[in-house]
A protein has these predicted regions:
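Conserved active-site segments centered on acidic
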Residues: 1-62, 70-85, 157, 161-162
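Short secondary-structure boundary segments
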Residues: 69-70, 91
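Acidic side chains
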Residues: 45, 63, 132-136
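Phosphate-binding/catalytic loops
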Residues: 77-163
């Protein structure tokens, strides 16, 4: 869901970026029917989506990695510690980005992202509030999927105005 929402918001702003999703579980699973229906109601077709598992090489090649939960961020940091400066939990990323302000395209994206991540410490992951997490809707009601879609769309819309 987040992949399709972010791609749409970036395209609306004329931003060319490669957006891909990957998870901690083994790949190969299609999007759930509830996710397909929720996104279709918002004009997005994710019916061809197939999950894939994240790998150290994917993390290494990514300019930005966004997780839904702090636990995912912890696990990815363990998987590829060198990618830590480019990995953020979504709410934390949006909040920090709003504090720094929009990325000036005349500067390298990596410089802006370093400013966004300034003063972050990995030890925060152990004490950070879980209330920042975006809950996984799998197995939940259609209403839960819709709430998750709205939360993600709000966060990703805000992020798209900054990158």
């Amino acid at each position: 869901m987040a992949e399709a929402l972010l791609r749409r918001r970036l395209e609306e702003r004329g931003i060319k970026a490669r957006v891909a999703s990957a998870g901690l579980l083994p790949g190969g699973a299609p999007a759930t029917e509830a996710a397909i229906e929720t996104m279709a109601a918002d004009g997005l077709d994710i019916s061809e989506h197939v999950s894939r598992q994240v790998s150290p090489s994917l993390l290494e090649a990514s300019h930005l990695v966004i997780t839904m939960t702090r636990q995912q961020l912890v696990e990815l940091t363990v998987l590829e510690p060198a990618a830590w400066p480019r990995m953020f939990q979504i709410r934390d990323l949006v909040w920090r980005s709003e504090q720094v302000g929009p990325w000036p395209p005349s500067e390298p994206f990596a410089d802006w992202l370093r400013a966004v991540g300034r003063d972050r410490n990995r030890s925060e992951l152990l004490s950070a509030p879980l209330s920042d997490d975006v809950a996984d809707p799998i197995g939940q009601s259609a209403a839960f999927y819709e709430r998750t879609r709205r939360v993600l769309d709000d966060l990703l819309s805000r992020l798209a105005t900054l990158v």
